[in-house]
Amino acid sequence: MKGFPKDIISKFDSYKYTDERGFNAINFEDFKNNISYKESFSKKNVFRGMHVQLPPFAQSKYIQVSNGSIIDFIIPLDSSRNDFGNLYHFEISSAESIYYIPPYCAHGFYAIEDTTFKYICFRY
């Protein structure tokens, strides 16, 4: 990257947390604009969740499985909703769409096979 002006290209270091289940990596965080790009790898039969961020750290997520497959779990935690506390689940495989998780939902997933999972988080 030598010779590139910093206002054209910037390099960011990621932070990876590894354990027996796989890893979680924070690839990019912009605290000023409250956005982060994260990635995880989970071995087959690993469950991650249920995670929820409460105000003032509430966040929405855009999620995508880039390799493998999961069963995704969502629980709405907004008490004004008719479906408050209901558990929703569905399977996501690689190369499928990107899914949106609202900020008032607990979220988790179960890796049906070794899975790489990417997500973009927006804090409110």
What are these regions (language model features)?
Residues 1-92, 115-124:
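Non-catalytic, conserved peripheral segments adjacent to functional cores
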